[in-house]
């Protein structure tokens, strides 16, 4: 029987086919703060596919959302950033400046990776709660405009 840590890593490995392309897609569709509609929709759909209840437009912000799985305590939250910065457009894999769109936005701080990494942790914890039968709530908070 796998340890808790091994099981979490197994879940993340099982989700690699979902998570890596998601990160690459976010890289290819950079959106600046409060304009991350593509990213918010992608995260929302992915959370729903993974069994989370999604609440959109939190606090009246069109690109803010949360995903919730489970019930009761403890409540464990993960923050997912997904905004890009203006003027940092860059072709994937290029080791010199090569903008996709001159002066366009880009993920200079790696939010395409950070947000998806947080999502991976939330999904792994969800599976742990499912497998163990333990109570608890997993929350994923989609954080728009973190750079603003």
Segments (PLM) and residue ranges:
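Acidic/His- and Gly-rich active-site-bordering loop/insert found
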Residues: 3-107, 116-136, 147
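Short loop/turn motifs enriched for small/polar and acidic residues
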Residues: 143-145
């Amino acid at each position: 029987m796998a340890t808790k840590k091994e099981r979490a890593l197994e879940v993340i490995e099982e989700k690699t086919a979902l998570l890596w392309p998601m990160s690459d897609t976010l890289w290819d569709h950079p959106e600046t703060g409060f304009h991350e509609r593509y990213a918010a929709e992608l995260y929302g759909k992915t959370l729903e596919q993974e069994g989370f209840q999604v609440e959109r437009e939190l606090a009246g912000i069109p690109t803010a959302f949360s995903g919730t799985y489970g019930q009761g305590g403890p409540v464990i939250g993960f923050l997912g950033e997904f905004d890009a910065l203006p003027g940092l457009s860059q072709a994937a894999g290029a080791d010199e400046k090569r903008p996709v769109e001159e002066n366009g936005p880009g993920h200079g701080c790696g939010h395409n990776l950070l947000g998806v990494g947080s999502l991976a942790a939330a999904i792994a914890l969800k599976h742990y709660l499912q497998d163990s039968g333990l109570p608890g709530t997993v929350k994923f908070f989609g954080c728009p405009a973190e750079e603003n």
